[in-house]
Amino acid sequence: MDQTLIQEILEVVEQAAIASAKLSGKGLKNEADAAAVEAMRKRMGQIQMQGRIVIGEGERDEAPMLYIGEEVGSGTGPGVDFAVDPCEGTNLCAFNQRGSMAVLAASDRGGLFNAPDFYMKKLAAPPAAKGKVDIRKSATENIKILSECLGLAVDELTIVVMDRARHKDLIAEIRATGARIQPISDGDVQAAIACGFAGTGTHCLMGIGAAPEGVISAAAMRALGGHFQGQLVYDPAVAQTSEWADMTKEGNLARLAEMGITDPDKVYEAEELACGEHVCFAGSGITDGLLFHGVKFERDCTRTSSLVISNLDNTCRFTNTVHIKDGAQSIALS
């Protein structure tokens, strides 16, 4: 990958965010998702590359998707693998709530974890705690370690957990330590990445979410030097979701085996989920969130707010882009 390709990858998430934002607040979850998917696919098709989707959203709940194994790009140029979520937080977008964004991770061929659209147990933490907290330890142990690594009292820590029935025991354990919980309804990528930046007020992400977002988060956290671990969840009894009502543990294990995953219980480090020499994360806000603003529509332009994190040059670029409309007369500075 080079800087020209990374710039085009930024434009991919910008276009997906704009397409989805046009349906924000209309209660049309699937339509917003489909619009983002098609915009992302169209812009990827204009890039001179041999692109491939290795993990994406949609397989779990039959949403529109860029499917696993789909080839994107012009068909010539460098080989690039993608993990994508064109509309992260579809419910958030549908009801114009904070935290929805278009996101992806990209790497050279073979550089991203290839898995079905399953669930994943995740642990994200700041760089100071990297290699010290561990997903195999209890929440209580990890919170104590976090407190020591960050120099904060336990009751000063904020732990983000998705508000799901499957997390009832986890939430109770965290509260018993005295740490503070920030429950989120959807979209854990921003929470994971926020752990990699100082001053966000987010100190840890714990719990089970979607696997594609886990790979995307891992790519960002690897470039940031933060801690991220993931472990696939294949048992419907653990996932506790209606989306898996017709799925079985045995069937899910067979699906993993088909994709070459011989150790379904393996704990993956960020460097294994995003193992390529060059890895980048790109995200663009659909609605306002912790890391960036949502899409803003004006008479003469559309404004997007985005973030690109890359280990190619060890940079984090916060980008505000003005997309000028045809026939524009006057563009405000901000």
From Swiss-Prot:
Superkingdom per UniProt: Bacteria
User: Which residues of the sequence carry a binding annotation for Mn(2+) 1?
Assistant: 33, 57
So what EC number does this one have?
3.1.3.11, 3.1.3.37
- Give me the Gene Ontology terms describing cellular component: cytosol
The metabolic or biological pathway listed in the UniProt record of this protein is: Carbohydrate biosynthesis; Calvin cycle
Which amino acid positions bind Mn(2+) 2, per UniProt? Answer: 85, 88, 213
Keyword Metal-binding carried by entry? yes
GO function term, MF aspect, one: sedoheptulose-bisphosphatase activity
One of the protein's GO biological processes: gluconeogenesis
Which controlled-vocabulary keywords does the entry list?
Answer: Calvin cycle, Carbohydrate metabolism, Hydrolase, Manganese, Metal-binding
Quaternary structure (record): Homotetramer.
- State the protein's name: D-fructose 1,6-bisphosphatase class 2/sedoheptulose 1,7-bisphosphatase
Organism of derivation: Parasynechococcus marenigrum (strain WH8102)
